[in-house]
Amino acid sequence: MRDNTIGSLIWLRLIRFTNQSNQMSNEFLKRFDLTTAQFDVLLQIRTYQPLTQMELAEKVTVTQGGISRMLTRLEKEGYIVRKQDWKTKTISLTEQGEAALERALPEQLAFQSSFFDDVLNEEEQKMLYELMTKVHKHSEKKELPQE
């Protein structure tokens, strides 16, 4: 571990936290018959509906192929509807999808917030948010190094 820079240690910590948090969220969301990815997709659809599959894929952490399969499943379960508007197919929540999200949302947000609320005060949380936002914005512009 001596060769690691503080930046690489932060990156490893973020990866481990993300994996652990996703595993725990998946377990938590089982009580609502949802996965973390499905919850995220439903929340993004509700926030931006109607939207195309391509627009949705840009907003979530699921691959294009994974989005396709997930949308098919969510449509079969009655949570979403896909409508063809001339050349564009848009996605919206159904009443059933809205109800599922409303049941899960408050509890999932409280669960996720507890990761931070339990150990960081409000000022520390704001600082962490600002730092992560700064790193995220930089990462969106970052290019791969030349070979």
UniProtKB/Swiss-Prot annotation:
Residues 1-137 form the HTH marR-type domain. One of its GO terms (molecular function) is DNA-binding transcription factor activity. Keywords: DNA-binding, Transcription, Transcription regulation. Disulfide bonds: none annotated. Residues 53-76 bind DNA. Pfam families: MarR. PANTHER family: TRANSCRIPTIONAL REGULATOR, MARR, TRANSCRIPTIONAL REPRESSOR OF EMRAB OPERON. This is Uncharacterized HTH-type transcriptional regulator BCE_2019. It comes from Bacillus cereus (strain ATCC 10987 / NRS 248).
